[in-house]
Amino acid sequence: MSVRPVVITIDGPSGSGKGTVAGLLAKRLGWNLLDSGALYRLLAFAARNHGVDLTNEEALKVLAAHLDVQFVTSTDLHPQQIILEGEDVTDAIRNEQVGAGASQVASLPAVREALLQRQHAFLEPPGLVADGRDMGTVVFPDAPLKVFLTARAEERARRRYQQLKESGVDANLSSLLGEISKRDERDSQRAVAPLKAAPDAIQLDSTELTIEQVVERIMSEIAARDLAG
């Protein structure tokens, strides 16, 4: 009888650092990585490329079921590359327009259902680190370790501003804060899989912590629960 691989979930709002933390954890553990938020960004990005309206639930469902996507673990500073239809779109899907589109398509029940099975397929040996907004509540509710990572909205906006500036993209801090606040409200109030911590999740506020400090805290939990084998 085969033993089911372990999955660790990391949920949280936009800009909390969950994607970077998940990528570094997966690299440290030698496990698979699922960036579920990227799946919704990829869908919004692909929809625009293929001329699919973001309100056309049926067409988006079909597109979601056939997304040709790969997550490739790379360097410490950039824990993963995201490949869509053979093209590296890691940076292309990280702008605010694609993020808004991702939040829009994520509110559609048929889209979430189409992507649910795709997310389950990432759970393969030796283990999986899955980050998103409903990993611990909907996608992997039986995960033995669930983390809900957050930070104050002002700090999340500052991080995003710094990230954009380092990438050579013009950004406005107050506009970013407004966009993050709107997205928080939209994600937490949507009818399907709203953003919330699982009852048994460990809640970490990363406002005053470095990425490495967050990773070490989670690694301590993994060791305490003997999840890494």
From Swiss-Prot:
Annotated GO CC locations: cytosol
Organism superkingdom: Bacteria
Family: Belongs to the cytidylate kinase family. Type 1 subfamily.
Enzyme Commission designation: 2.7.4.25
Origin species: Azotobacter vinelandii (strain DJ / ATCC BAA-1303)
Signal peptide: none
Residues that coordinate or bind ATP: 12-20
Broad class of enzyme this protein falls into: transferase
Keywords: ATP-binding, Cytoplasm, Kinase, Nucleotide-binding, Transferase
HAMAP family: Cytidyl_kinase_type1
UniProt xrefs under InterPro entries: Cytidylate_kin, Cytidylate_kinase_dom, P-loop_NTPase
CDD domains, A to Z: CMPK
Cited Pfam families: Cytidylate_kin
Cellular compartments annotated: Cytoplasm
Entry protein name: Cytidylate kinase
Main localization, broad class: cytoplasm
Catalyses which reaction(s): CMP + ATP = CDP + ADP; dCMP + ATP = dCDP + ADP
Gene Ontology BP, a term: nucleobase-containing small molecule interconversion
Lineage: Bacteria, Pseudomonadati, Pseudomonadota, Gammaproteobacteria, Pseudomonadales
Any one GO molecular-function label of the UniProt entry: dCMP kinase activity
